[in-house]
Amino acid sequence: MRGFYIGRFQPYHNGHHSMVERISEEVDELVLGIGSADDSHTTHDPFTAGERIMMITKAVAEYDLTTYVVPLEDINRNAVWVSHVESMCPDFDVAYSNNPLVVRLFEEAGIEVRQSPMFDRDRLEGSEIRQRMIDDESWRDRVPASVVEVIEEIHGIKRLQHVSDSDSLERYAATGESLPESLDDLDD
């Protein structure tokens, strides 16, 4: 049996890894869909699809599970999203997701969906890990060692910190606020 599991994997973290381990007990093969594959170099989506493929491929190598990592661009049309996924991926028998919209879309398309409890969600959330990277706080214990290696290889922290600064500048420009004259002028 082949399963399907989608995520943005920004970055691939220990919560995703625990989910893949759980799924590996139920299926013979797994398709890992990289959502928002067309987005990168932003605070929300700092890593490219290729970089996420490297993270995932290296991390799941420890499991005795045939995996296919497939980048999936956003199409922003929920009514045809499952058809888009099916056209881009090997056939699969069951989808795994805890996202209510994804669950609904697959169920409406007649595809079995299995959900599982989130793994240490407070610590293992992509936005929290990215913020820790930006703030130069501890994050390495929240991702597999192979993912740390990929992020270091691509200078991912430096990129994320840089795009975070750019995003901040864009927010100031969009709101018409003036930038503070010094860091001392920023509110805590």
Curated annotation (Swiss-Prot):
Family named by the database record: Belongs to the archaeal NMN adenylyltransferase family.
UniProt xrefs under InterPro entries: Cyt_trans-like, NMN_Atrans_arc, Rossmann-like_a/b/a_fold
Record bears the keyword Nucleotide-binding: yes
Organism from which the protein derives: Haloarcula marismortui (strain ATCC 43049 / DSM 3752 / JCM 8966 / VKM B-1809) (Halobacterium marismortui)
Catalytic activity: beta-nicotinamide D-ribonucleotide + ATP + H(+) = diphosphate + NAD(+)
Main location: cytoplasm
EC number(s) given by UniProt: 2.7.7.1
CDD domains: NMNAT_Archaea (cd02166)
Region Disordered: start-end pairs: 166-188
Record localization: Cytoplasm
Entry protein name: Nicotinamide-nucleotide adenylyltransferase
Keywords: ATP-binding, Cytoplasm, NAD, Nucleotide-binding, Nucleotidyltransferase, Pyridine nucleotide biosynthesis, Transferase
Catalytic class of the enzyme: transferase
Pathway participation: Cofactor biosynthesis; NAD(+) biosynthesis; NAD(+) from nicotinamide D-ribonucleotide: step 1/1
